[in-house]
């Protein structure tokens, strides 16, 4: 089954359909939510100094580096705040090193915390989708340090564009272990279809509203 579906991922017609759906939905969606984007930008500027957006390096299709766009959710001196926090709370270093996440992250602003819980901080990635660096649905974008955690699954990861949403997001998000996340990403890649994308997109909205596994 996995072999057959991997051939589908290489099928130009199927990939063209996926790309067309990405382009149409991201453009229409971006226009529809533009007023919301403006309000979020104003809230960020009013709460803390610094830019509204920030870019992060991630690994994209073919192993190439892409620069994903997000709303800024942290203070400007985030790295300094993090290192101080970990020094003062050494028991939390293991939690940080395991998944690069903290349940009570001191770097995150009040507006940023709300944006993360609702996943609204990732809306600017619609631009990455339009540009062709990401897909609406796909594996969670990873950084270089995560390659070793993916192991043999990394080869599968680089076959497709990373997504704004995916099986991980609709299956528990941060409540899942990293191993479970890799398994879900690999399952998606090996069982990809247009209908699976539609199902994940449909499930994304209630998951976001419910905020399950978000922090």
Regions found by a protein language model. Give the residues of each.
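Juxtamembrane amphipathic/hinge helix adjacent to a transmembrane helix
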Residues: 1-12
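A short, structured surface patch at a secondary-structure boundary
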Residues: 95-161, 200-208
């Amino acid at each position: 089954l996995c072999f057959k579906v991997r051939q589908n991922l290489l099928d130009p017609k199927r990939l063209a359909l996926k790309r067309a759906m990405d382009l149409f939905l991201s453009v229409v969606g971006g226009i529809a939510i533009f007023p919301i984007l403006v309000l979020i930008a104003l809230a960020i500027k009013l709460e803390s100094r610094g830019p509204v957006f920030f870019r992060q390096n991630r690994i994209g299709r073919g192993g190439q580096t892409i620069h994903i766009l997000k709303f800024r959710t942290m203070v400007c001196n985030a790295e300094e705040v993090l290192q101080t926090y970990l020094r003062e709370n050494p028991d939390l270093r293991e939690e940080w090193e395991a998944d690069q996440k903290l349940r009570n992250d001191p770097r995150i602003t009040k507006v940023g915390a709300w944006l993360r819980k609702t996943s609204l901080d990732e809306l600017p990635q619609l631009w990455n989708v339009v540009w062709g660096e990401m897909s609406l649905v796909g594996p969670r974008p990873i950084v270089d340090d995560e390659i070793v955690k993916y192991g043999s699954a990394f080869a599968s990861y680089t076959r497709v564009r990373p997504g704004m949403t995916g099986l991980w997001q609709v299956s528990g998000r941060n409540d899942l272990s990293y191993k479970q996340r890799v398994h879900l990403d690999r399952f998606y890649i090996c069982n990809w279809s247009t209908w699976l994308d539609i199902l994940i997109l449909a499930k994304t909205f209630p998951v976001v509203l419910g905020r399950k596994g978000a922090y």
